[in-house]
Structures are given as C-alpha cells and as structure tokens.
A protein has these predicted regions:
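Membrane-interfacial terminal anchoring regions of lipid-handling membrane enzymes
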Residues: 1-19, 28, 32, 55-57, ...
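Catalytic core of membrane glycerolipid acyltransferases/transacylases, capturing the structured
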Residues: 12-35, 42-44, 59-115
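Short gly/ser/thr-rich secondary-structure transition/capping motifs
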Residues: 43-51, 119-120, 174-177
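Short acidic-hydrophobic, aromatic-tinged amphipathic segments that line or gate anion-handling sites
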Residues: 51, 108-111, 201
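Non-catalytic C-terminal accessory region of glycerolipid acyltransferases
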Residues: 120-233
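Generic preference for hydrophobic
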Residues: 51, 64, 86-87, 193-195
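Short amphipathic alpha-helix with an adjacent loop that forms part of the alpha/beta core around
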Residues: 53-58, 125-128
C-alpha cells in the first residue's frame, strides 16, 4: 500500500507540474500523500499518532529541525508544518520528468559530495525560500538513526537561522520505535510528535542554536519513550 500510494502521489505530482499553480496549491498534493499514508498505517497496522505543541508554530516562515529515525516523519512533515522546502540530493532534480515535477515544489537541491560548500548551498537556497514565504525543513542528523541513538547535529539549519533571523522550531518524536529505519515492518501503537518552543537565534551563534535544539530534541525523545505507550509492547 505504501508503494501504491506513492505511485499515485507521483502521478498527481507530474500532473500538477503541468498546471500554473501557486506553491500553496501544489502543496495540497504532498500534504494529501502524507495524510493518506499515515491514515493507512493506522487502519492497516494500528499505528496512529498525536501531535502536541502546534501552538508553538510561528506565524512567519521558520526552520524546523526534526529528529530523524524513520520513514514516517518524511510523511508527517508534509502536514505537521506549513508548506516548507526540504533538502534533497541535486541528482534527484536531474531525473527526467520526475525531477522536473519535484522542482516545482522548490526543494533545496544540494551537492552532498561538496563538503563544506554543501552547507553554503543550503544556506543560500534556504535564505531564498524563507524570503519567498516558505519554511525550511532540516534533518540535522543527516540520516535516519536507530532508536536511542543520535550524533552531532549538522550546523546548516542553525547557520541559516543565524544569517536570516528565522526562528528554529525543534520537533521530537518516537517514530523510530514503531517503524524502524530500513524496515517496512510497522508495530501497532501511537507515535507522539512534540513541537517545541521556537528558538530565537538573535544574539546566538550557530553552535549555540544547534546545541539548544539538540538538547531539547534528545531530552524530549527520552521523555516520550519513557512515558506509557512510548515504545511498542
């Protein structure tokens, strides 16, 4: 069902690329994709979710830093936060037809083999997206982490915040315990998503912003996991 739903998503994605739509109108498609597949996960696998802290979402464009441990949050990002740009390998944009359609959503295309200049690409393109009224989604761990694990957060999101003044919103969850990385197996339960208070980068260094975000996210994940229902039975 996941693959079938994704197939329908790409069909409508290609169709939308042919129409003169605004980014808000185009975003209806990935939002519907995320909502429909997470709904299917609930109906078929008994895997539901709750979202807390939505009152913390700023009314102006912001940068959301997400814990990354599962495929699930790549679906949820489409409806948990307002229309936002996410980063991807620039090679995706080069895929015939599909890459062209994806580019209409204004992703941040990064040459990940470029080392430090990849951070500069992220900041430059991220600044443009924020100026256009879009948010920016960042997974600072850079890859999906196993449950209970993390590593030093990448600095690109925090650096973008410091250079633009955009607030950073940390987002924690326990999805990796129910839908593990590199696995299609989903365990019944409830994923808890918690949106943290915005971090104002004014007067802070990128390192300080990053540390505050990581400390909050990792502490909140530990709290979620320790609570009743925080892990599968």
């Amino acid at each position: 069902l996941l693959f079938l739903g994704t197939g329908f998503f790409f069909f409508f994605l290609l169709l939308s690329a042919l129409l003169p739509l605004s980014i808000e109108q185009r975003y209806v498609i990935p939002r519907a994709w995320g909502l429909s597949l997470t709904w299917l996960a609930k109906v078929v696998c008994g895997l539901g979710y709750v979202i807390e802290g939505q009152e913390n979402l700023p009314s102006r464009p912001f940068i959301s830093l997400w814990k990354h441990s599962s495929v699930w949050e790549t679906l949820a990002q489409m409806f948990v936060v307002p229309p936002a740009s996410w980063s991807l390998k620039r090679e995706v944009i080069w895929i015939p037809i599909v890459g062209w359609a994806v580019s209409t959503f204004k992703p941040i295309a990064i040459n990940r083999s470029a080392g430090h200049s990849a951070v500069n690409q992220m900041v430059q393109q991220g600044r443009e997206r924020l100026a256009s009224g879009m948010g920016v989604i960042v997974y600072p761990e850079g890859t999906r982490m196993a449950p209970g694990q993390t590593r030093k957060y990448g600095v690109s999101g925090a650096l973008l915040a410091c250079e633009t003044g955009a607030p950073v919103v940390p987002i924690a969850h326990n999805s990796g315990y129910f839908w593990r990385r590199r696995s299609l197996l989903k365990k019944a339960g409830t994923i808890r998503v918690v949106i943290g208070p915005p971090i104002d980068p004014t007067g802070l260094t990128a390192r300080e912003v990053n540390e505050r975000a990581q400390q909050w996210i990792e502490a909140k994940v530990a709290e979620i996991v320790a609570a009743p229902g925080g892990v599968p039975r």
